[in-house]
A protein has these predicted regions:
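Short regulatory "switch" loops immediately downstream of catalytic or recognition motifs
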Residues: 1-2, 20-21, 202
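Bacterial N-terminal signal peptides that target proteins for export
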Residues: 2-16
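Bacterial N-terminal signal peptides
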Residues: 15-25
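Sec/Tat signal peptide C-region and signal peptidase I cleavage site
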Residues: 28-32
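Exported/periplasmic ABC-transporter solute-binding proteins
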Residues: 33-57, 63-65, 70, 74-80, ...
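Short active-site loop at a secondary-structure junction
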Residues: 105
């Protein structure tokens, strides 16, 4: 009799635990929000992984809107439905603060990027930087459009400091975002490509190529800022996401993609 009662009690305890877990799961789903996050192209692969981690932990779903920082800024200024903006630089988030399009006190630097020169053209592998840029073997050099793409602006800065930007103007192919520049290089439509370090690390076949380091004194620091927009202020999940981005686990993920975290 005692044994049967013990079995019944154990069964009841198990049922109660299962019901409790189901209740928590249901509540998480009921409270889950869709958060619209505008993400600079260089950060697309990291955010897709972070998105899954965030959903597992909180139940909230990130809807990613991807593009150059400049194009995302234009969307925001025109009333685009973006709750959080992860830019590839600092100027545009600061402008959103000035224009009162953001929640004050939410701007922060989530990563610092590095500019690299990269190629799949084996004929260039033995050349050194910056001499490689003036080689007769180089016909096409890809950079992001400096007007819209922060890594493109950094590329232009580097070329100007070396003193060859105008000389190379006929060879420059402008990409609408940094991912497009990388893909043009990967498809061998470019001899050289100025890309983010994260582009190279993210791509599983990057070992085929040659990477040239670009001295960081040739371009302004690429501090990538995030900020919450006014629509995000109404969503508890948006605040949770900003906190999640600065957690130790997420910082490690970001470092693994080639970014500097200070």
């Amino acid at each position: 009799m005692y044994k049967n009662n013990k079995i019944k009690k154990t069964s009841c305890d198990l049922i109660i635990k299962i019901m409790f877990l189901l209740l928590i799961s249901c509540n998480k789903n009921l409270l889950a929000e869709n958060l619209y996050v505008g993400v600079a192209s260089n950060f697309l692969e990291p955010i897709n992984i972070i998105k899954e981690d965030f959903k597992k932990e909180t139940g909230h779903n990130l809807i990613i809107i991807n593009g150059s920082s400049g194009s995302l800024y234009t969307q925001i200024m025109n009333g685009g439905p973006i709750d959080i903006f992860l830019s590839a630089e600092q100027k545009l988030p600061k402008k959103l603060e000035i224009n009162k399009k953001s929640v004050m006190g939410t701007r922060f630097t989530y990563a610092k990027g590095e500019l690299k020169l990269w190629s799949l053209n084996k004929a260039l592998f033995k050349k050194q930087f910056p001499e490689i840029l003036s080689s007769n073997l180089v016909k096409y050099i890809g950079i992001g459009n400096p007007l819209f793409v922060p890594y493109g602006y950094a590329s232009k800065e580097a070329l100007e400091k070396i003193g060859i930007f105008k000389t190379l103007s006929d060879k420059l192919i402008l990409g609408k975002n940094i991912n497009q520049v990388f893909l043009m290089g990967y498809s061998r439509n470019l001899d050289l490509a100025f890309v983010a370090k994260s582009n190279i690390i993210s791509n599983k076949n990057n070992k085929k190529g040659k990477i040239w380091n670009i001295p960081q004194n040739l371009y302004s620091p690429i501090n990538q800022d995030g900020i919450m927009l006014l629509s995000g202020e109404k969503k508890k999940g948006a605040f949770k996401f900003l906190k999640f981005l600065v957690s130790d686990n997420v910082k490690k993920r970001i470092r693994d993609f080639g970014y500097i975290i200070e």
